Amino acid sequence: MTQAVMLQGTASDVGKSVLAAGLCRIFYQDGLRTAPFKSQNMALNSGITPDGKEMGRAQIFQAEAAGITPDVRMNPVLLKPTSDRQAQVVLMGKVATNMDAVSYHDYKPRLREQILAVYNSLAQEYDVIVLEGAGSPAEINLRDRDIVNMGMAEMAQCPVILVADIDRGGVFAAIYGTLALLHKQERDRVKGVIINKFRGDVALLYSGIEQIESLTGVPVLGVMPWLDVDLEDEDGVALQNDKYRGNAPRDITIAIVQLPHISNFTDFNALAAQPDVRIRYIRRPEALTDVDLVILPGSKNTLSDLAWLRESGMADAVLQTHRQGVPVMGICGGYQMLGDTIVDEVESGLGTQPGLGLLNTITRFAQDKTTTQVNATMSDELPGWLAAAAGLPVRGYEIHMGETVLQEGCCTAMTLQKNGCSVADGAVTADGLAFGTYLHGLFDSDAFTRAVVNGLRARKGLAPWETTFCYAEHKARQFDLLAEAMRQHIDIDKIYTIMQQYQEPV
């Protein structure tokens, strides 16, 4: 019989996704067939399964931690915000519709049956399911139609472990308050607490732990220290908290423009892991100094973010940096923004708008979304800092709703292999100072990444870094380090006992 455990949090960004990945790794190491599951994920970081389905990046890296291929059943509902009030609803990997928050709240009960069926089908194939909640189960205004926290735990008939973040302060109030706001049957489902992101001497917590256990009747299963592991984040909260503003001195500095609707910033994890690269996320024009490459990332609302670039002064800063000879790269929405013209009657309804004009391209938005994994080959001749990447194989995935056509003065950057056909992708100028592509995950291709970083090194008169950094091995090491730390600081035997002896609350 399949066993299951669910991690819920006292708030967003308390570390549920990472700890769920750690449990997946531990169970995998212990020889159990393990799968992650999150019924509903709200994030702009998404990826594509081998069969072309879109799902949240968190469940993708949790699946990787479990040693299995990502499956869209692990995240049947994905919400991708397009504005402060609306989100694109992706069901079982395909776009269903756009909804505002009120409409979606009314719609959720219709999803319960489908979510339960998907969960049950997944559970039939694995020994353990590690479920993850969203935000907090104490959102009492949403409880009556909940499908992701206690509502999901009820459907799965599984125990819950509550995760609390001590780094933000008020951890005991967060634990007590969360449990106090739950119904009795829901509280009875919570079998343990993990205090996460602790810095300092854990002995200082002992008296507080004793008191919170006495007040709530729920044992604290462990105190996880703040870990220096390099793992993906589920959403933009990490960016808002300045997690990625690197300060370590490195030979190469790459600026990522932090768009308001930035998507798939996990594209840059492999870059950030390079031993000679420093990544800086930039929100203000005055911060765009002393950089070797500027990247415009993906966006869930291209024209809105393009307008922000102009209004904030970032567009002028990017163009000025480009005039000074610094290369500018765009990925997906960022690629579209680098062009001359964007025609959008779909995403924003704003019609024809001028781009930044660094690439002579025209982009037209379409109703249908392209979602596919692809293999590609970089063009045989590439200029400037990209020259060493010429002819290299790369792999990635597409998630976009537009088609970009190259005009005079632009060359194709790469050739994709799709459905047995060769398809041109991307654009690069003759001097190599503007380069764009639709391909997400490009920097996960180790040889390509080392080639372009060495191209940037050459521009500064630095010798190439001869050793190619293997990002897949790096991720595997991070999963193992996480699992090792969790075994050291959390009572994993107790979690096994909780799963094995769990009985549904009456």
UniProtKB/Swiss-Prot annotation:
Keyword annotations: Cobalamin biosynthesis, Glutamine amidotransferase
Domain GATase cobBQ-type: 251-448
Domain of life: Bacteria
GO BP of this protein: cobalamin biosynthetic process
GO molecular function: ABC-type vitamin B12 transporter activity; catalytic activity
SUPFAM superfamilies: Class I glutamine amidotransferase-like, P-loop containing nucleoside triphosphate hydrolases
Matching PROSITE patterns: GATASE_COBBQ (PS51274)
Residues at the catalytic site: C332 (nucleophile), H440
Keyword Cell division among UniProt keywords: no
Pathway: Cofactor biosynthesis; adenosylcobalamin biosynthesis
Pfam families the record matches: CbiA (PF01656), GATase_3 (PF07685)
InterPro entries recorded: Class_I_gatase-like, CobQ/CobB/MinD/ParA_Nub-bd_dom, CobQ_GATase1, CobQ_N, CobQ_synth, GATase_3, P-loop_NTPase
Family in the record: Belongs to the CobB/CobQ family. CobQ subfamily.
UniProt cross-references to HAMAP family, sorted A to Z: CobQ
Function: Catalyzes amidations at positions B, D, E, and G on adenosylcobyrinic A,C-diamide. NH(2) groups are provided by glutamine, and one molecule of ATP is hydrogenolyzed for each amidation.
Protein name in the entry: Cobyric acid synthase
Organism in which the protein naturally occurs: Salmonella schwarzengrund (strain CVM19633)
Organism classification: Bacteria, Pseudomonadati, Pseudomonadota, Gammaproteobacteria, Enterobacterales
